Amino acid sequence: EYIRDKYNFVESEKFIQELAWRDFWRSYAYHHPDQLWKDVEEYKTGFLAQEYADNLPEDIISATTPTQIINVFIEQLTSTGYLHNHARMYLASYIVHFRKVKWQAGAKFFMSHLLDGDIASNNFSWQWIASTFAGKPYIFNLENVHKYCHRSIDILPEKNREIDGSYEEISTRLFPNL
């Protein structure tokens, strides 16, 4: 009630939804603690788990990837310990799908930097992105980033070529085996 009284409906509804997801992930982790670091299901990307790298590439760690917006997200995460929910999903998707790195490596990277890090929310959200705890992989494109982040970040297609394209084009490029 406090949140609903203090904030408008849209703001309070989103916050309450995020709390509900956090509660769901914690409950799931309580009942399935063995799945915090293991794939709940197989990847639904057309690739086997062993085809993904075990470690983050150096350009991700150092925020020097070919994609400007991803570098901005990495720098924000490592310098502030915070990253907006959409930016977390974009960065996770980039790491797993665009760079073919196991979700566990990205989850560890996030947990080492997030001030609000919760292992259950973090890891199962990574699995949802990766498709090991969802029906399909989560992907994004530059248009989606522009829709949710355009006010705070300058987004130029020529500096973000990896993520510039329609969902169909990106999906075909990322998942040629599907």
What positions do the PLM features span?
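C-terminal catalytic domain of photolyase/cryptochrome flavoproteins
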Residues: 1-85, 93-178
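Beta-strand-enriched accessory nucleic-acid recognition/scaffold domains that flank the catalytic cores
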Residues: 89
